[in-house]
Amino acid sequence: MLLSDLLGQPLVYVFAHGEALVDPSRIDAAMRRRLAGEPLQYIRGKTEFFGREFRVDERVLIPRPETEILVETAIERIDRGARVVDIGTGSGCIAVTVALERPDLRVIATDVSVAALAVAAQNANGAVRLVGSDLLAAFVEDFDWIVSNPPYVKAAEIETLATEVRDHEPRGALTPGPAGTEVIARILDQAGRAGLILEIAYGQLEAVRDLAAAHHFNVDAVRNDLAGIPRVVVLSRHGWK
C-alpha cells in the first residue's frame, strides 16, 4: 500500500509495472518514519473507516474499527430529522459518516483543536458544519442527540499503550485526566435533554453508569465490540426516552 501511495497509482498498477520507479529519497523518508514507530496511516496520510477513505495525520486520532460500532448505533437509533452534534470530531469520521449514511439528519461537528478541525474540513467536503468549541460552549441551541468518542484513557495508563499510539497520536485526544471519565462527565453536564451515544474504555462501564445516574440519565443500551468488551453506551435523560 505504501508503494502505491508513493507512486500515486493503484495497487493493480504497482503489480503490473515492476519497472515503475519511486524517488529513493521518498522511500527512505517513509521507511525512516516507520522505523521510528510512526503509524502507517500517518505516513500514508489516510485510512479507511466505514468503507470510506479519510485523511489523517498527527493532528488527529486514527479512526478505529471499534468506533464503527458507535456510528452503526447512531445510524440505527437516531430519530429522523434530528439535530446531531459530534463532540471532539477529530478527523470528522463519525460526523461525516453519519451525515452521509443518514442525509435526513442535521449534523454539526465540534472540536476544541483548530488543527483537528482543519483535517476534518478536508474530510467533510461540506457534508457537515464544523465549529470550534470546547464541547458545547459555543452553542445556545439545543440538540436532539450527541455522539462522541471522547478522550477516555486514564492518565496513568498512557505509558501502557502501544508505542505507535503513545508517542505519535495527539495526547489530548487520548486522555482527559486521572479518572478517564472527566470529559464524559462534562458532556453529561452540558447535554440538556439530548440523547447520547458515547464510546467508552475497557472497564469503564460501571463508572459511566454511575455518572449517568448522577446526572439523571438512563443507560438504554450497551454495545460490545468484537472482543465482547462494552464499547458504546446509549443514554437518555430520565423521562425523555
Question: What kind of region is each of these model predictions?
Answer:
Residues L2, G37, T67, I94, ...:
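Residue-level signal for inorganic ion chemistry
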Residues L3-E76:
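Conserved AdoMet
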Residues R44, V131-S133, I200, N224:
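Short loop/edge segments at beta-strand edges and connector loops
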Residues E53, R106, A127-R129, N218-A221:
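Conserved beta-strand segments of alpha/beta enzyme cores
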Residues P65-T160:
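Conserved SAM/SAH cofactor-binding pocket of Class I
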Residues Y152-E182:
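Mobile active-site "lid"/loop adjacent to the S-adenosyl-L-methionine
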Residues P178-S236:
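Conserved Class I SAM-dependent methyltransferase catalytic core
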Residues H238-K241:
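Flexible, glycine-/basic-rich loop-and-beta segments that form/coincide
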